[in-house]
């Protein structure tokens, strides 16, 4: 199977107004293949958020190589990184970040609108198909504020899939939900992973959910533990 994500010796240092650099990631190696469903765990301050920002092409590493679908992202311009991020990576966050004035359908269409600039029938069809897949066809014209927390997070999952990404980064996607809704959202992502072969990297503090992933990677003090 092809590698969707490959990290080779990723390091990250910060210089916060002093001549001394602080290194927060120390040579991270990680490989994910198409169809992987991986849990990323670690205590607060371990470097998880920094690592996720680098994987999501929101920040550049200080050293090492990051490859997405075999492409060395260190060789890309900022605009090329933005294009790659928009097409290859989907994001689901703990707080859904839906636009409250928009309907569920309009929220799912947002990544396509950013990419293409103008709504069309194909976008609406794609959004409706994704809302059907996450079980929200009946709510497609509801505003984001007129849905439950679990429904809002399902819309966020559909939005993450709008550009048919190879990799979805889910940062504590169930952390703001009750137990049943959290399980439902997790199972939805798991089903999509199995049906579409979409690779998922799930950041979670929930041991039960992590145990149901294919693999658990723990980050401690800026390194992969074990």
Swiss-Prot record:
> Which keywords does this Swiss-Prot/TrEMBL entry list?
ATP-binding, Cell inner membrane, Cell membrane, Membrane, Nucleotide-binding, Translocase, Transport
User: What EC number(s) does this enzyme carry?
Assistant: 7.6.2.-
SUPFAM superfamilies assigned to the protein according to its UniProt record, in alphabetical order: P-loop containing nucleoside triphosphate hydrolases
Q: What does this protein do?
A: Part of the ABC transporter complex LolCDE involved in the translocation of mature outer membrane-directed lipoproteins, from the inner membrane to the periplasmic chaperone, LolA. Responsible for the formation of the LolA-lipoprotein complex in an ATP-dependent manner.
Subunit structure as annotated in this protein's UniProt entry:
The complex is composed of two ATP-binding proteins (LolD) and two transmembrane proteins (LolC and LolE).
Q: Where is the ABC transporter domain?
A: 5-225
Keyword Lipid biosynthesis carried by entry:
no
Gene Ontology terms, MF aspect: ATP binding; ATP hydrolysis activity; transmembrane transporter activity
What residues does ATP bind to?
42-49
| Name of the protein described by the UniProt record | Lipoprotein-releasing system ATP-binding protein LolD 1
Q: Does the keyword Ribosomal protein apply?
A: no
- Principal localization? membrane
Its transmembrane ranges are: none
Give the membrane topology: Peripheral membrane protein
Q: Where in the cell is it found?
A: Cell inner membrane
Q: InterPro entries, alphabetically?
A: AAA+_ATPase, ABC_transporter-like_ATP-bd, ABC_transporter-like_CS, ABC_transpr_LolD-like, MacB-like_ATP-bd, P-loop_NTPase
GO cellular component: a single term: plasma membrane
Reading the lineage from the top rank, the first entry is: Bacteria
| Species per Swiss-Prot/TrEMBL record | Rhodopseudomonas palustris (strain ATCC BAA-98 / CGA009)
One Gene Ontology BP term is:
lipoprotein localization to outer membrane
| Family designation | Belongs to the ABC transporter superfamily. Lipoprotein translocase (TC 3.A.1.125) family.
């Amino acid at each position: 199977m092809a590698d969707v994500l490959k990290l080779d010796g990723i390091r990250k240092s910060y210089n916060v107004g002093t001549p001394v650099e602080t290194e927060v990631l120390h040579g991270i190696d990680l490989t994910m293949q198409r169809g992987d469903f991986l849990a990323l765990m670690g205590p607060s301050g371990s470097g998880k958020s920094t690592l996720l920002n680098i994987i999501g092409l929101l920040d550049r590493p200080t050293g090492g190589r990051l490859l997405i679908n075999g492409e060395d992202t260190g060789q890309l311009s900022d605009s090329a990184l933005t294009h790659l991020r928009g097409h290859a990576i989907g994001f689901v966050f703990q707080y859904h970040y839906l636009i409250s004035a928009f309907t569920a359908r309009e929220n799912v269409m947002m990544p396509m609108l950013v990419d293409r600039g103008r709504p069309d029938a194909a976008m609406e069809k794609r959004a409706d198909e994704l809302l059907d897949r996450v079980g929200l066809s009946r709510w497609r014209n509801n505003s984001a504020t007129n849905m439950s927390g679990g429904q809002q997070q399902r819309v966020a999952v559909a939005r993450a899939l709008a550009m048919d990404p190879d990799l979805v980064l889910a940062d504590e996607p169930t952390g703001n939900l009750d137990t049943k809704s959290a399980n439902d959202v997790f199972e939805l992502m798991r089903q999509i992973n199995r049906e579409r072969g979409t690779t998922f990297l799930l950041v979670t503090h929930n041991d039960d959910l992590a145990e149901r992933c294919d693999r658990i990677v723990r980050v401690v003090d800026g390194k992969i533990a074990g």
